């Protein structure tokens, strides 16, 4: 929700609204017990791909360095809490979430426990996770697209990891 995921997100505001580099941009994550994925989807014209890669890398690095603002974190918590409660209305969503919790945590957690854990998250914790994800040797980059996307992918990786 902070990096991508909505119209107020950093990537949407910078890459799409301010700079007009993408017609769509989003960030998502899939956590796992030992490893996970943080993904970014961006739809862009080929001639804007390199600049889009640079802007995206800068937004990620800034979030890892400075962390979210208090307002960004509060907004993200509100959105995530609402999605947790709404997911309880669907048996499919609820069972999938419970199964994922068993895989990751070893046991299911109640929605109330998840909301309490979410409320306890701080700006400094978000910053620490960002720094850990971006630590040298901990991340890989993959870019899908036409041949020109390869150059944009290299720029993205170099901007983030050196």
Where do the protein language model's features map onto the residues?
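M16 family metallopeptidases and their MPP-like homologs
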Residues: 12-121, 136-145
